[in-house]
């Protein structure tokens, strides 16, 4: 399981941006027209215009949408190839129970108080192939995790109304809070914003909230990528995980993939 976290690398925003611009310049005809992003029900969820042919960086917001879309395509491939294979090997080798995940969730400062068992159970489901059930727990819990971090660093996570009542801000607003961006890895925030909440990205959180996502979709591509991304996220702040890595000669000398983790499934 720790080897799985070593194989996973959060992609840098700058690398995604350079890839989008590079592909646009190398294949201008293929990127001359916009495209409609369609969900599983055949509905158009977003009309994505093309980038400016003279200056792809002219509209930063539009460029960001293309970055989410480009990242999604790579995430689907990674999920369907190396992550699906790696998870299958894990299932064939082990039957994961909650105790095997203690090292990941116990005393992990990033997990909100009282949510350790929830994460533990969801990850057990995910690693044992119960993907549909796992996604329905992990997506809202990861959203709450980032809300909690934002609160801890002084970000305002609610909108105050004139009558004195308050309403929780939407996830995209939470992940864009200056306080959160100042204190947390922006590449990780970008990844989870695309996975959970962007129509140009995977939009997993909203598809789950509206009952759109299918059982099959939860067992493929970007959903597998999301599940492994959550494991990686938790491993970064797990003291036990750090100690295991520190004391294991095999894990200590593992070569972290520089660019594309697809090369590690041999």
What are these regions (language model features)?
Residues 49, 61-132, 254-263:
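Charged alpha-helical initiation segments
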Residues 148, 167-171, 233-238, 252-264:
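Eukaryote-specific, cytoplasm-facing alpha-helical/coiled-coil scaffolding segments in long proteins
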Residues 110, 173-203:
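Short, mixed-charge amphipathic alpha-helical segments
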Residues 4-6, 262, 266:
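Sequence termini and other peripheral, non-core segments
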Residues 81, 114-117, 129, 133-140, ...:
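Generic recognition of stable, solvent-exposed alpha-helical segments in well-folded globular domains
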Residues 1-69:
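The feature captures two recurrent sequence modes
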Residues 92-178:
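Secondary-structure-rich domain cores
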């Amino acid at each position: 399981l720790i080897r799985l976290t070593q194989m996973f690398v959060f992609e840098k925003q700058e690398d995604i941006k350079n890839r989008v611009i590079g592909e646009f310049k190398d294949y201008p005809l293929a990127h001359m027209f916009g495209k409609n992003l369609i969900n599983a029900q055949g509905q158009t969820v977003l009309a994505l215009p093309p980038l400016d042919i003279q200056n792809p960086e002219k509209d930063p917001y539009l460029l960001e949408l293309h970055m989410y879309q480009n990242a999604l395509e790579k995430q689907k491939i990674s999920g369907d190839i190396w992550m699906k294979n790696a998870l299958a090997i894990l299932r064939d080798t082990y039957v994961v129970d909650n105790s095997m995940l203690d090292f990941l969730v116990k005393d992990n400062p990033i997990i909100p108080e009282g949510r350790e068992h929830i994460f533990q159970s969801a990850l057990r489901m995910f690693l044992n192939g119960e993907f549909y059930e796992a996604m329905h727990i992990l997506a809202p819990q990861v959203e709450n995790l980032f809300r909690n971090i934002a609160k801890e660093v002084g970000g305002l996570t609610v909108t105050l109304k004139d009558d004195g009542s308050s309403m929780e801000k939407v996830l995209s607003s939470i992940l864009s809070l200056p306080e959160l961006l100042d204190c947390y890895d922006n590449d990780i925030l970008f990844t989870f914003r695309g996975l959970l909440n962007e129509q140009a990205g995977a939009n997993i959180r909203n598809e789950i909230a509206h009952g759109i996502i299918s059982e099959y979709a939860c067992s493929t591509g970007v959903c597998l990528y999301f599940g492994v991304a959550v494991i990686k996220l938790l491993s970064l702040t797990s003291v036990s995980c750090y100690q295991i890595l520190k004391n294991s000669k095999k894990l200590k000398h593992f070569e972290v993939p520089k660019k594309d983790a697809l090369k590690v499934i041999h």
